[in-house]
Amino acid sequence: MKEIIKLSILGKDSIHIGLHLWPHITNELFTCIFSPTYVIITDSNIETLYIPSFKTYFISMAKQRSINSRLLFFTIPPGEKSKSRKTKALIEDWLLSEKCTRDTVIIAIGGGVIGDLVGYVSATFMRGVRFIQIPTTLLAMVDSSIGGKNSINTSYGKNAIGTIWQPERIFIDFTFLETLTEKEFINGIAELIKTIIIWDESEFASLENISEKIAKTVRSMSLTSNKHSKFNEIIKDLKRYIISSIKIKAHIVSIDEKEKDLRTLLNFGHSIGHAIETVLAPYILHGESISIGMVKEAELSRHLGILNPNVVSRLIKCLNTWGLPTSFKDRRFKEVILGKKHLIEDILEIMSIDKKNDSNNKKIVLLSAIGKTYEKKASSVSDDDIRTILSQNILLYGIPLNAFQKHTTITLPGSKSISNRALILASLSNGICYLKNFLHSDDTYYMLSALEKLNAAEFKWEQDGDVLVVKGKSGYLENPQMELYLGNSGTTARFLTSICTLVQPNSRENHLILTGSNRMKQRPIGPLVDALKNNGCCIEYLELENCLPLLIKPKEIGLYGGNINLSATVSSQYVSSILMCSPYAKTQVTLSLIGGKPISQPYIDMTISMMSSFGIKVTRSHSKENTYYIPKGCYTCPSEYIIEGDATSATYPLAIAAITGGSCTISNVGSASLQGDSKFSEYILKPMGCEVVQSPTTTYIKGPPKGKLKSLGSINMESMTDTFLTAAVLASVAYEESKPYVTKITGISNQRIKECNRINAMVCELKKFGIEAGELPDGIYVKALNTSNLPYSVEGINCYNDHRIAMSFSVLACISSKPTTILDKACVNKTWPYWWDILNSTFKVQMKGIEFDLNPTINSSILHHPSECTIFLIGMRGAGKTTLGQLAANFLGREFIDLDSIIEEDIKTTILEFIQKYSWDVFRRKELHFLKTLLTEKKENYIISCGGGIIETEEARDLLISYIEANGIVIHIHRNIQDIIKYLNTDKTRAPYQDNIMHVWERRKRWYNLCSSHQFHMTSTDPTEFKKNIPLNLKSSFNNFLRTITGKNNIFSLILKKKRSYFLSLAFSDLENIFSLLDIITAGCDAIEIRIDLFQKPEEIDKYPSLEYIAEKIFLLRQKTSLPLIYTLRTTNHGGSFLSSEKKLAKEYILHGAKWGFEFLDIELDIASELFKTINNSWPYTKIIASYHNIEKPISCDDFEWIQKYKEAQHYGHIIKLVGTSSSIEDNFFLEEFKSKFINKKVPSIIINTGIKGQLSRIMNTFMTPVTHPSLPSKIAPGQLSIKEINTALHIMGLLPEKKYFLFGKPIKHSQSPNIHNLGFEILGLPYKYQLFETDSISELKEILHLEEFGGASVTIPLKTNISILLDEISDHAALIGSVNTITRTYNNGQYILKGENTDWQGIIKAIKNFNKFEKSFENFSGFIIGAGGASRAAIYALLSLGISPIYLINRSKDKLNKLYHFFNTNHIIPITEYHELNNINFDIRIGISTIPTDNPIDPSVLEIAKIFFNLKRKSSEGIFLDMAYGSNTTDLTIIAKACNWKIIHGLEILLEQGSEQFLLWTETYIPYNQVKYAILGPNK
């Protein structure tokens, strides 16, 4: 038997540790823990892995010893969902059925779920039986198996119910670790780190130094078949730290078993971590949650002034080494976290029921140092402090008046630039170097982590993290066998690109990959790569040209050396990268900087100076400009290298002193600094009126009185470009009445390609304070405001993930009159992670954390496109940009600009002639210039059409991408490329392409996609004809598209108001198959669902259709219907056809759905968690339906999984959709119980069971129920019903009672209204009846209005103007018209309300707009109305609403006309009774309306006047005449109008339109319009 280590807990040697323990365990059972019945409880995963071996040993030893004990087994499903009341009851019932008694011994074999559950069963079964823990996961070994805690989960929280019941034995068998996956292994490491960091400083230091080695081996175990030998490499080290962790926990539990004080320390990271785990379950593992929790609780300690900031950084570094998430932005974590709404408040709510809490005080373990806590128990912490740490954004309240003008002293964190250079130089050296004041930040972490993975050096921390000890390996680097992720660290990316050329080739995988964040993948690195490739290095771009990710193939030769030419006008880091690498080249390097004056020369000088400190002297040529000679050699490091403070960071506290009139000393940056930015005080602050005193190592400044900063005028900041943001903020309040107060900062063009486009960002964010600023070709101008007039920012400051922007605007926030919200506060982690703590503790700035959802203003300004932001159109020549751009300008009421046209205005010739005279390159530069101008000067209320080749220029692409990132809209107008080619081949007016058109398209299409936020797909039309006459259905679809993407579409809010709503599910491989049925099958529907996963191109049945094919079908459908569309990509895991394994492709397809302007996206939960924030930011008006389908079980309160899925969907969706299955009618009752318990009425939900027996759930669902139609060939899901079937069922169930509707008036016997409404009721299956009630007396209506079954009524002559006395209220429209034509009856607050409405005017407007569909405005037109009865009131109101003026009223009765004129009391109405009153009519008469009933003869004088109007010359070619008579289509007036070429709209058409509005008021749905229209008007209408 192997060596067994026994540890004591609570005075007993209960913990046994070793390898291959089955024989030992069996022996212990039979000798020390004997029982007649042993019960093994495990899960189905563990059962097959370990139970056979244990059973073999147990039976063998029992036989040898003649023991007859029973061995029983109970297996449960794996996972957190089994840790429930239900499972506990199942186990207990089974134990009783097996006649188990109090002498039974229960053995838990498994992870934490098994241990917790079985421990609780053991504690309560027979009032407590003995049990044994055999943990099979690292997490369970170091945490849950030790100490006796046990529990189950409830719907109210994790581990909500449980006891403390100590196991008889805990057997820790390291053999189990060998079978764990990498993720399972690392999940347990978090708990191990937690235990060690609170108790043992030396053990933590040892662990962090060896973590990379162990983690690397663990990762490699999954890549090799020889897993056992790999495991043996690390088992010795692992045993040490596992045993240390167990010892610590056992010691603490022995002192405080019941968790009164000391044991609460073991909850470090758990107060916040458990809450995170509960909110995000099941997608986040326990260890991952605890990892985040530890970091947040350590940050809380730092924020409260208890903990050295370096400790936080060391903890983060250690956790990250293992691949554990350390922030809500962590790449390994944000797939789940992004998009969670109310995340922080949810976490705080869960924390409020933490078992450690004392009354309402939240208790958290606070670290005071590594190995030491602030108290020997958890400490009370306020919600505000927790919220500040957890929140993504921070609200700054400014510096209190009593803190102004106080002196502060700041010791800066180490310089990022020097830290990263020192790290490289020390790693490449041949000795040991102590780096002091090393910066702990995101940027240096990425560098340090990458160098560790390259095995470039050995690293360890000393002096509580203040000193980093580096043992270099003389330039030897290994291939890490994994990609190196560098975040958004441009410094790291550029330096490592050269360093990685020194990596030794590896026989297994001879390449390595450098990658980074999305922004990093847009930042240029081309000049550096070009120089290295020209020197023989093998480097490839994996995505965009000139950007990360890079694939680097190491060579034996490494860097060749010799003459290297490098363009350094973009970044000095290119130069530093090659300089530092050059001593290890094969031949001596001569580095020549070409292409113009290098940018940021002081940083090149800094690198050279530091290389000298490490033993390599670089010589600058005296004869050749910008040329350097670098000798071969190996760096020799100094024993100690002190890193000075970060000079750029120094500008922020100094600027606070300057802007407030205070004083500040920086203790570790002075005149001797290597950093160019150290000159900021002398060159910027001093001229602005500050007193400046510098020693070699310190800087002191005192600001002038508040509001007295002097303007700089014009200043070139090329030598200190990163500090321009601080200067710009100060310039914004440098207001002097007697002097110019505009500051121009130049020489900073490189700031456009930093973490973001900083110049553009500064302009945008200053505007939020009311400060005018604008871009210059290589800089920015800022117009100052007097500080006393400085408005506060009502919107949050968008930091663009840029630390410099966050810190700069925090300076301005110090003097703001109201709180300022800084969004994405964690971006400062790049250089100064504890900047907010400095503001709070040193400058006394009050602050609190804030979420988007807590501040609607921030929500709208940041997450949504500005409502009037300028829209840019891009796309191939001939795609229709200009035509659609003009249309868009008309729809949205904006000005249209054609970029090509303004260029031609400037060059005074055509583009064709200009290109022939100069070149395409010259034209592209001109085009770029105007694009920059438009982006700067035309930010709102424009539609701008760009030339097809605008995206050929890299800088133009960057500008468009930046505009999109700033929530601008760029639409790619696309037409089938073959249609474009056909058209362009006949167009000789434009400059010819230099390449084949198809080749041009193939080159550009990726750029169009990258540079656009949206795409509108033009269906096949002849471009020439298209220009002349745009099809109405195309106009309509484009209008709906624009309304959706600009947020002017209120569809979602309208659906929410309905008592019942439905969407039609379409299951077709080709949508064109149902176009002819569309009007019929969508009757009563509020939306249409398109199942993209079912699309299939006939000739490509074995693969997914292309996005272009899908777009073509979708946009064809758009032209056939105005209903909103639901874009659904259902995967095989959820019952669909799209392979669940194709997750990356699925995301691409879904994001294109958003790009195409879909109103709704149905996204499955696991994908929704990853895409929510992207969609919410980039396409804020598209609503997400977060869906989960499980067709194997019903929805029930007893199933923890459904509760979790509901909570997840609530976070990720604007709409929740859960679909289970029914095997019995009772399952639907369980579903209703689930809804009653868990439904959050603020988030609408679709919760149904599928299958025939689930139909009841569909009937009972009220919001957006998926439906089918009998005209469709098949149902998309079993049990799906039509709207008619649902309404019929609701009626039978008594939930939809009969109603009667009436037409009141006289004469009405020939009315078509009963036919219209009854046909609508019949089609939709509504149990309603519409009938005539002929009367001219309102007294006869009193009784009928109060019938129980009365639903509503139509009102016609002669009752329209006097029926209101019988009603409870009338609408504003009806009151303004003075006429009621519709009565509704609603139930409100226990009583029925009769309300009068008027839909006549709506019917008139709809009829006019349907005919003249896209006339944006009628304001330049006039019209006439014949008649003066009740209907004429609605006609007048309709024309006034359209903006038509003047309106001529024609009638023989002057009294009636005067009555109407005085009722409306407006000069827009001109009464006409006689012929002579028609003199001098100079208006454009476009619309005429007759309100005279069919059976009333027209007075001859009125007819003569009408003839004059019909014959008046109109500016437009068409006039529209509406004859509201419902009888014959031919009247005297229509005959005259037709003869004068007026278009006629007959009375029945208007009746149908206003009846449709009545139907909507009564039923909440539009009438099946085309079916009713066909039946009433006939097929020709």
Swiss-Prot record:
Binding site for Zn(2+): E191, H270, H286
Ranges for region Shikimate kinase: 868-1065
Catalytic reactions of this protein: 7-phospho-2-dehydro-3-deoxy-D-arabino-heptonate = 3-dehydroquinate + phosphate; 3-dehydroquinate = 3-dehydroshikimate + H2O; shikimate + NADP(+) = 3-dehydroshikimate + NADPH + H(+); shikimate + ATP = 3-phosphoshikimate + ADP + H(+)
GO MF, one annotated term: 3-dehydroquinate synthase activity
Annotated cofactor note: Binds 2 Zn(2+) ions per subunit.
GO cellular component: a single term: cytoplasm
Ranges where the record places region EPSP synthase: 396-845
Annotated spans, 3-dehydroquinate synthase: 1-383
Active site: E259, H274, C827, H1189, K1217
Subunit structure of this chain's protein: Homodimer.
Role, per record: The AROM polypeptide catalyzes 5 consecutive enzymatic reactions in prechorismate polyaromatic amino acid biosynthesis.
Family the entry assigns: In the N-terminal section; belongs to the sugar phosphate cyclases superfamily. Dehydroquinate synthase family.
Protein name: Pentafunctional AROM polypeptide
Underlying gene: arom
